[in-house]
Amino acid sequence: MSQLETRTEPMVVNFGPHHPSMHGVLRLVVTLDGEDVVDCEPVIGYLHRGMEKIAENRTSVMFVPYVSRMDYAAGMFYEAIVVNAPERLANISVPKRASYIRVVMLELNRIANHLLWLGPFLADVGAQTPFFYIFREREMIYDLWEAATGQRLINNNYFRIGGVACDLPWGWLEKCQDFCDWFGPKIDEYEKLITNNPIFRRRIEGLGAIGRDEAINWSLSGPMLRASGVPWDLRKVDHYECYDDFDWDVAWEKEGDCYARYRVRIEEMRQSLKILRQACEMIPGGPTENLEAQRMAEGKKSPFTGFDYQYVSKKVAPTFKIPNGELYTRLESGKGEIGVFLQGNNDVTPWRFKIRAADLNNLQILPHILKGAKVADIMAILGSIDVIMGSVDR
């Protein structure tokens, strides 16, 4: 080994793959000069399960339950993207009501994702108390999912080509609005505890700073990109689903450090609440119980039996064939841009199914921003990126 400026030999330390701060089975081979990080080599692949090859040997309907095992904090986002790709390739329309239901589920998942990021991140930097608070709110989201889909964290299997698996249960939208009313003050509570806490701010301000051009050149996305001064959100850029119907703002900051990434995610939860409240009020047909009452009262000629009031355009047969052609479709998850490149050959299984995971791209900048940092800051910087290794390794 070559000698360093301190006239000592560099020390190589392994973090993980079995370490509570690794957020999964991630291994970091870190070279240290005393307390300073000289080099860092992430070692991934411990959780590789061949998801793309599984997708290429399953029909579009069969693969939906698999995807929530990739990023188990963002199962709804992956369900959405794997049905969006065949929909676009086959030109299948989605009813307005189904699109609203999808948006509600996606925004609930965004909040759950950020909460699952917030608790462990704060625990990494020494704030243990909020770690227990976030599980209280996440349980309420899981209760809503359980009522609508039958499952809680993963294996919701709710999204379908052309819509969703079933309409919302009676009283569900009211419960969702109750959650919004409950959760808004809780965000204020988090901020009161954390945001201007001088110990917390001194711990993470200025850490892992990424400039605007760096973020673009490293192909970052999501809060990692928006915290570096780039207000890029695919919900605004690509106009998918019905996000254009709602009044909301893109959360972004300029500093590019761990603290900026924290503030972006806090603000995103507030914006998700705005979208949820509007979606619950504006959903075509209103609550399911009201919609069914209107249909029964007015009969088959009721306008509420029209296309935009359905929860699915047409139930796709198990023998649904993906048309010839190829496309790339993407959406904004809690971690950033997730996408699917789909190549069909007029068969029930895709010829090629390539998955783009946001956290894999975001993780690649880690060695770059760790150089020169202190060994105690490794966990704070890694935690601010928000990685789930099931999604990174696939």
Swiss-Prot record:
PROSITE patterns linked to this entry: COMPLEX1_49K
Enzyme Commission number(s): 7.1.1.-
GO biological process: photosynthesis, light reaction
EC primary class: translocase
InterPro entries xref list: NADH_Q_OxRdtase_suD (IPR001135), NADH_UbQ_OxRdtase_49kDa_CS (IPR014029), NDH1_su_D/H (IPR022885), NiFe-Hase_large (IPR029014)
Main localization, broad class: membrane
Cellular localisation: Cellular thylakoid membrane
Membrane-protein topology: Peripheral membrane protein
GO terms of molecular function: NAD binding; oxidoreductase activity, acting on NAD(P)H, quinone or similar compound as acceptor; quinone binding
Signal peptide segment: none
Pfam families the UniProt entry points to: Complex1_49kDa
The reaction(s) this protein catalyses: a plastoquinone + NADH + (n+1) H(+)(in) = a plastoquinol + NAD(+) + n H(+)(out); a plastoquinone + NADPH + (n+1) H(+)(in) = a plastoquinol + NADP(+) + n H(+)(out)
Keywords: Membrane, NAD, NADP, Plastoquinone, Quinone, Thylakoid, Translocase, Transport
GO cellular component: plasma membrane-derived thylakoid membrane
Family stated for the protein in its record: Belongs to the complex I 49 kDa subunit family.
Subunit relationships: NDH-1 can be composed of about 15 different subunits; different subcomplexes with different compositions have been identified which probably have different functions.
Record-linked HAMAP family: NDH1_NuoD
Function per UniProt: NDH-1 shuttles electrons from an unknown electron donor, via FMN and iron-sulfur (Fe-S) centers, to quinones in the respiratory and/or the photosynthetic chain. The immediate electron acceptor for the enzyme in this species is believed to be plastoquinone. Couples the redox reaction to proton translocation, and thus conserves the redox energy in a proton gradient. Cyanobacterial NDH-1 also plays a role in inorganic carbon-concentration.
Protein name stated in the entry: NAD(P)H-quinone oxidoreductase subunit H
Organism: Prochlorococcus marinus (strain MIT 9303)
